[in-house]
């Protein structure tokens, strides 16, 4: 009997070595390290990674999170069908703006597939190899999107176990890949037919299975804080929104540039203190403060080398601002 349970995954190393363009310091009188926000602000700019149980819809889970924390707004990223379990990140309040960025990295699942006729491990591995890379996929009949043919990338297909006609495998794939349809297509390629028996998501963007908590854990943590003033558990189960943006390359700006960006300005070369290696033109980048706070996201108009060598010009076209205006003092002048 093959069961889908929690698996151990490697810890993500989110410490990136940045290139210094200009040595500057930050003023600790305003702003703060995202992990040291007041608990009320952590909730306002936070993410709860729920271990979704079998049964409820993803929308129901988001609603429960909103009710538990007494919030006005909460939203999930990457819908899971009611019968599917696993990693479901739920953004809280202001952090809901970051959800579109969660779909950039691939997702990972562990799937139990049932073959309608037996097949050898050798044949299964051969077909897995054929399905690794870019594949054509038409969404299933019950999908909430138009059933047009789409291209999706399968990064990895790994056979974990086989017990008769039951096949347990891990798949790392592009966001928007239908695993149910993948099982059917694999069965067709094997000549056996197949269907998805069980599915568990183990990773969604930067959020891993090790980050996931049960809804009861969230409720208990909230009660501990409200009734006893104990923040420890709530800080454990709520991640700052920056945690879900670690996959993006960074452009770190000076304190003097932050409020201008919050008011809609683009990122100019003169306002940059540090940046990631290997930024390419047109790439989506995260604009951060020197304390590690997410200010905005935008498209890079220059690559890393060009930003380092430039003395003026727009480096990042800002597309979405996350930080509230007034978090940092205004240090810019209006044009007359």
Curated annotation (Swiss-Prot):
GO terms for biological process: box H/ACA sno(s)RNA 3'-end processing; mRNA pseudouridine synthesis; rRNA pseudouridine synthesis; snRNA pseudouridine synthesis; tRNA pseudouridine synthesis. The lineage of its organism: Archaea, Methanobacteriati, Methanobacteriota, Methanomada group, Methanococci. Residues 248-323 form the PUA domain. This is Probable tRNA pseudouridine synthase B. It catalyses: uridine(55) in tRNA = pseudouridine(55) in tRNA. Pfam families: DKCLD, PUA, TruB_C_2, TruB_N. One of its GO terms (molecular function) is pseudouridine synthase activity. SUPFAM superfamilies: Pseudouridine synthase, PUA domain-like. The gene is truB. InterPro entries: Dyskerin-like, PsdUridine_synth_cat_dom_sf, PsdUridine_synth_N, PUA, PUA-like_sf, PUA_sf, tRNA_PsdUridine_synth_B_fam, TruB_arch. It is an enzyme of class 5 (isomerase).
């Amino acid at each position: 009997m093959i069961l889908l349970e929690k698996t151990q995954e490697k810890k993500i190393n989110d410490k990136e070595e940045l290139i210094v363009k200009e040595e500057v310091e930050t003023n600790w009188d305003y702003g703060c390290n995202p992990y040291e926000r007041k608990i009320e602000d952590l909730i306002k700019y936070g993410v709860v990674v729920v271990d979704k149980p079998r049964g409820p819809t993803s929308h129901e889970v988001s609603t429960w999170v909103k009710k538990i924390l007494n919030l006005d707004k909460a939203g999930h990223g990457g819908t899971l069908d009611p019968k599917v379990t696993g990693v479901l990140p739920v953004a809280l309040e202001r952090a809901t703006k970051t959800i579109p960025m969660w779909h950039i990295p691939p997702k990972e699942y562990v799937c139990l597939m049932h073959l309608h006729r037996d097949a050898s491990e050798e044949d299964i591995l051969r077909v897995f190899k054929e399905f690794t890379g870019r594949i054509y996929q038409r969404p299933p009949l019950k999908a909430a999107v138009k059933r047009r043919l789409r291209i999706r990338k399968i990064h990895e297909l790994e056979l974990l176990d086989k017990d008769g006609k039951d096949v347990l495998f891990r798949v790392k794939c592009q966001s928007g890949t239908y695993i149910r349809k993948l099982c059917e297509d694999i069965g067709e390629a094997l000549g056996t037919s197949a269907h998805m028996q069980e599915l568990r998501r183990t990773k969604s963007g930067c959020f891993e299975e090790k980050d996931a908590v049960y809804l009861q854990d969230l409720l208990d943590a909230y009660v501990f804080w409200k009734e006893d003033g104990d923040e420890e558990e709530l800080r454990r189960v709520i991640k700052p929104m920056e945690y879900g943006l670690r996959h993006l390359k960074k452009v770190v700006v000076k304190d003097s540039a932050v409020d201008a960006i919050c008011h809609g300005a683009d990122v100019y070369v003169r306002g940059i203190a540090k940046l990631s290696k290997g930024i390419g033109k047109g790439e989506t980048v995260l604009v951060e403060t020197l304390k590690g706070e997410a200010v905005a996201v935008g498209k890079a108009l220059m690559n890393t080398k060009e930003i380092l060598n430039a003395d003026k010009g727009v480096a990042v076209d800002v597309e979405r601002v996350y930080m509230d205006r007034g978090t940092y003092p205004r240090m810019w002048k209006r044009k007359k």
